[in-house]
Amino acid sequence: MKNLPGIRSWSKIHNSQMNPNVSASKINLFNADIPMFVMNYGIGKRSESPPAAVRGIVIEDAVASVLQGRRSIDEAVIKACERFVQVFYALQNDSHKQYNLIRPMIELSCEALKDYGIPIFNPDGTQEKIEYTLKQDTWEIPVVGYLDFVFPNGKIVDLKTTTRCPSVMSLSHQIQRAIYQTARPDHEVEFLYVTPKKFQFLSDGDVPTLMDEIKTTVKRMDTFCSLMSPEQAAMSIPINPESFYWRDQYTLQRIYNEQTKPKTKRKTKTKTLEKME
């Protein structure tokens, strides 16, 4: 990293998660919700994964096992359901709803990717990591990310399980795709959206234009971090408890709001000598 002093200063804070690099998730969170960005990367506290996020993780792993021939679809579904229940052992409300989506989403994902070939992973089974340097004028910073599925046919697919299939990719997903496409220009990057009833491949957004927007965001992020410490940001920027990021996150709300309280110095006991008569 070069000439981005704000990001560098946050990366050196004790307990900070602000590594001296950027990713699609870091950029998108900065664009979407500054207080949660402060909480995650500055204060170093994150929320527990909601049922929909856990559903997405177990489905992605299940689809990989089927495409690699390690499991049948039925076996993959059983394993995915077991993993989900390990996290949400008491299926209630949203967790029960997400549990019921696992089978149809695995089946449709495998159907969508059946002709793509066997995906390529690292020897230890982990996803392929991308890393390159983003530069503009006098500054530069590493960009990192992980690819869901890399196929021998020259395609990279990022799997998105959702209850509603979009007609156009969201800006946050376009930013993510642009980062991946820039890292692997010899491949075609697609996003596969899978609902319980259908699937669709999308690849929206002009990559050069999006990369210019990403550079602007990185510079804004650095300026923000230069002007405020995480504590100063928490004292200045209120959270919206009704937003997607903060809803039901009562522990994180408390931790964030505690940053506004003045730090009390520990009192040290001093011994006094009494004058003897």
Regions from the language model: what does each represent?
Residues 1-146, 255-256, 260, 264-277:
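Metal-dependent nuclease catalytic cores that hydrolyze phosphodiester bonds in DNA/RNA
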